[in-house]
Regions:
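N-terminal alpha/beta PP-like core and its mobile active-site loop of ThDP/TPP-dependent enzymes
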Residues: 1-207
Length: 207
């Protein structure tokens, strides 16, 4: 549930009682009624490997889900008597296939760039979804001379020793004086709800 709430692309391999005993109510150790349904309610996608031959397809699908759309955990349930099964050939590529990203609205990008270029006191806020873009964010921060505020999931995107990396107490102070907020792969929900906004502040949400 934590991975789901934090948009973390986690692959969870879940143990299960022997395949033939699932749903029989034998009272086996670790037996949970309809465990797969519970798993589906906590993940972006969940499936069960019921034989060695289906492992390739199910795992490939799981990795595809991890790499596409909104980051969320994916679950794969494996009964205990399937773990040691062997298959002649594992045909699929677990890395998956490239996924097309969202359509880019160039007009909105140009508008955002114009706002940032004319800003006097810009601030960048980063979330966990921006972890793979550390180099780009550091370059952007330097070019704008914009301090970077990171909540827990965004820690480390900008090195803590950098002059442009600020702590939350300092970030709260800067928030009250900035004219533009560039929020990268974060809803910026906590800052807006607890630190407040005003009519003079422009917030650009990306991702």
């Amino acid at each position: 549930s934590t991975a789901y709430a934090l948009n973390a692309p986690v692959l969870a391999l879940i143990g299960q009682i022997p395949l033939g005993a699932i749903g029989k109510g034998f009272g086996l150790l670790h037996e949970i009624p309809d465990q797969l349904s519970i798993l589906k309610s906590l993940t972006k996608k969940a499936d069960r490997i019921e034989n060695a031959e289906s492992a390739s397809k199910i795992l490939t699908s799981a990795f595809s889900s991890l790499q596409s759309g909104r980051p969320r955990p994916v679950g794969v349930e494996v009964p205990v008597n399937i773990w040691n099964s062997q298959v002649e050939k594992f045909s699929d590529n677990l890395i998956g296939h490239p996924h097309q990203g969202p359509n880019v609205n160039t007009d909105r990008i140009e508008e955002a760039a114009s706002i940032l270029n004319s800003s006097k006191r810009p601030v960048i806020v980063v979330g966990g979804g921006a972890q793979n873009f550390s180099i780009e964010i550091n370059n952007l921060s330097s070019s704008l001379s914009a301090p970077v505020i990171a909540f827990r999931n965004g820690d480390g995107i900008v090195d803590g020793s950098s002059q442009l990396s600020v702590t939350l107490p300092a970030g709260r102070e800067l928030w009250g004086h900035c004219d533009v907020v560039l929020a990268l792969v974060t809803r910026c929900q906590t800052a807006q709800m607890t630190w407040g906004v005003d009519d003079q502040m422009k917030i650009i949400l990306v991702g």
